[in-house]
Design a protein with these regions (language model features):
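Extreme N-terminus of proteins, especially the signal/transit-peptide cleavage junction
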Residues: 1-3, 75
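Enriched for short, Lys/Arg-rich terminal
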Residues: 66-69, 74-97
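Basic/aromatic recognition patch in beta-strand/loop cores that engages polyanionic ligands
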Residues: 48-78
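Basic, Lys/Arg-enriched alpha-helical interface segments
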Residues: 3-60, 97
Length: 97
């Protein structure tokens, strides 16, 4: 398994995403969670694949989309840090302040 860790906020984000989707469909919630976790594994091996978004934050993070969710991570941290996992429909800039 590639080295990475989820910040406390990212862990809560992932739990909230699962709970939200599970209200309608448990299997879909499991699938989305698994797809997010697989994307994080991919990003550990290819940390600069994501996009910088200076319009959203001055933090040295990158963004990678999985469905309507944004994995926000520090590509330079070792191990790679998943900072947040947020819905693209939310005010991401405000949530990263």
């Amino acid at each position: 398994m590639a080295e990475h860790f989820y910040s406390p906020e990212a862990r809560l984000d992932l739990m909230g995403i699962w709970e939200f989707i599970a209200q309608a469909d448990l299997n879909a919630a499991d699938r989305v969670e698994q797809e997010i976790r697989l994307a994080v594994e991919w990003l550990v091996r290819n940390p600069h694949l994501g996009h910088s978004r200076s319009d959203l934050t001055s933090q040295p993070v990158r963004f990678w989309a999985v469905h309507s969710y944004l994995i926000i991570y520090d590509p330079n941290a070792r191990p790679l840090e998943v900072v947040r996992i947020l819905s693209g429909y939310r005010d991401v800039a405000a949530m990263l302040k």
